[in-house]
């Protein structure tokens, strides 16, 4: 059995994933690309490469996603925005509404409707909301195709997710920070960097029985956190991760009954 494991590891390194050095070079390339885009680009948007390629993998059919984070719009929990009312850093502020959304999703209440374009908002008896559908339409360019929370170019080579940033670490996830970790992973230094990092909101809602996305919900995304955790893995763990991705694509995704249960 040990001999089979060694042969599989060698095959994955030589033919599928690449060596540890190759994986690190891929990551460094996309990190430099992000730095260039952010130094030379529009200050309104911050760019973070995402997807398998940015994680250092180049599997068959690997995706390349770009998270574009709007720096002018801030999202708060209600208690946070009330306590910081006089020190808000931007005119465009949104408030999380978790109670009326499915787990893992949120509605976004508009804090001051006077600052917002009317085409972006949706009003009903429960309040005033930022619509994910209108947001994607506002961010789209000619010939863009909507692909879940992303906008794809005409060739389908790059998926762009125009996201909003959660200013604080979510209260619903604070238990993750302090829970016991008997194996010492992730280390305290990494947890500290993760909490200081970005939790994003991407424009896609949960699916109803009709398989249509809820146009008012936004998915809470820990993709930046996931990327930081993946960067901390050993190369053996990366190999296992790649095997799971191949299993998902080559086996699970081909079963139409369970395909929609997985998003990546």
Task: List the predicted regions and their residue ranges.
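Non-catalytic helical "accessory" subdomain of NTase-fold nucleotidyltransferases
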Residues: 1-264
């Amino acid at each position: 059995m040990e001999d089979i494991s060694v042969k599989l590891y060698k095959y994955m390194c030589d033919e599928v994933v690449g060596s540890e050095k190759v994986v690190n070079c891929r990551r460094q390339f996309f990190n430099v690309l992000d730095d260039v885009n952010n130094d030379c680009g529009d200050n309104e948007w911050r760019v973070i490469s995402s997807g398998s390629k940015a994680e250092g993998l180049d599997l068959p059919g690997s995706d390349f996603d770009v998270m574009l984070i709007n720096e002018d719009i801030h999202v708060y929990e209600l208690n946070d925005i009330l306590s910081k009312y006089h020190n808000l850093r931007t005119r465009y502020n949104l408030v999380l509404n978790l109670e009326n959304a499915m787990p893992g999703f949120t509605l976004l209440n508009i804090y001051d409707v006077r600052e917002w374009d009317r085409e972006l908002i949706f009003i009903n008896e429960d309040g005033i909301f930022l619509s994910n559908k209108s947001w994607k339409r506002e961010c789209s360019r000619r010939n863009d195709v909507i692909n879940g929370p992303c906008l794809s170019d005409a060739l389908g080579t790059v998926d762009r997710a125009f996201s909003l940033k959660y200013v604080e670490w979510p209260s619903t996830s604070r238990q993750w920070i302090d829970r016991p970790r008997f194996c010492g992973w992730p280390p305290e230094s990494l947890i500290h960097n993760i909490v200081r990092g970005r939790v994003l909101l991407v424009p896609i809602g949960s699916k109803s029985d009709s398989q249509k996305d809820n146009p008012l919900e936004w998915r809470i995304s820990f993709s930046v956190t996931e990327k930081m955790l993946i960067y901390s893995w050993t190369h053996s763990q990366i190999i296992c991760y790649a095997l799971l991705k191949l299993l998902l694509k080559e086996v699970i995704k081909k079963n139409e009954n369970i395909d929609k249960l997985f998003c990546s």
